[in-house]
């Protein structure tokens, strides 16, 4: 399973290199209960990897599950949990995730003070 760990590490490093504010901007869309931090040394959690793939335009649950080597149910459960914790003013979460990292589209007025 070292290859999978290496894949995750490379994905996380590359993605955060492209979108360094991703974790903060993602957390700004959620209430305090759902806010998450990356793991040590810049590793993303499974939830953050799911939404990183959505940010990259991959929204199909089965495709996300295949890429992350987890079950469709796991992806569905994480997405459902996050959807329940979207701040009311955010609106369509996945549409907002698509805007993360695009200059001028980050709405810092919705940032969660718990971040």
Where are these regions (language model features)?
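Short, charged/polar, low-complexity loop and linker segments
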Residues: 1-2
